[in-house]
Amino acid sequence: MIKGVIFDMDGLMFDTERIWATLWKPALATLGLPYKEGLDAAARGSAGDSMRAVLRRFYGPDCDTDAIMDALHAQAETAFQAPPPKKPGLDELIAYLEAQHIPMVVASSSRMASILRHLNNWHMTDHFKALISGEQFTSSKPDPEIFLTAAKALGTTPAETLVLEDSYNGVRAGARGGFFTVMVPDLAPADDEMRRLYTAECKDLREVKKMLEEGELLSEA
C-alpha cells in the first residue's frame, strides 16, 4: 500500500496557478519585455535551471533569467498577501491520511518563502513531515530530484510513495522517478503524453481520497 504522500502546492493544494498566470505580463513589463504567448504554460511547475531554460527559449540565450524570475516573485509578494483558496477536498484528504498514519510532505517548485506563506496562512504547516522547495535544487521538475529527496524525508521508496501533481512538469518528474503518480489537472487538462506517464487521474482531491479509501491506489499498480 501507499506509505507516504508527496503534495505539489500550486494548483494542487491551493488555487494559485490562475494568479501566477496573470503576473508574467506586469513582471516582464518592469524589465521592458513583452509577454510571449505560451510562456506561462511552458514554465508552469518549473524553477531553477529548468525555468531558466524556458526563459532562454522564449527570450534568447542572453536574457537575464534571474532578473525575470525576481520580477515575477516581486509581483507575487503583492498578489499573495491574502491567502489563496484551498482546492476542493484538501482538508478531507489530509485528515484521512493523518487518520491512516500516512506521512506527508510538500514538494513544490515555489520558493520556500511562498510555501511557508501559504501554509502558515491556513495553519497547515504542522500536517507535513517536511517542506521541500525547488530553490534547493539546481534542476527542478521535470527532473525527479525534488521528489526523490521528498521520499527520503518520508522514509519511503518511490514505488510506495504517492505523488499528487497538477502540472505536466510535475507528472513528468513523478514518472521519471518511478513514483505512483496521480494527476489532478488544474489549468491544463491531461493530454496523451500525461496519460502515458501517470498512474491515475482524479478530477479533484476528494476523488483521490475516495480511491485511497477503496483501495484503488496500490503501490504495485
Task: Give short role names for the model-derived ranges.
Residues M1-K3, A95-E98, R111-A221:
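Asp-based, Mg2+/Mn2+-dependent phosphohydrolase catalytic module
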Residues D8, L12, S108, D166:
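Conserved G/P- and acidic residue-centered "switch" motifs that form tight phosphate/ATP-binding loops
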Residues K86, A107, S139:
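Residue-level marker of regulatory loop/turn positions in helix-turn-helix DNA-binding domains and
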Residues A42, A107-S109, L164:
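Structural motif
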Residues G48, S108, M112:
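Functionally critical, cavity-lining and gating residues within the transmembrane helices
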Residues I2-Q100:
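N-terminal helical cap/lid subdomain that shapes the substrate entry/recognition surface
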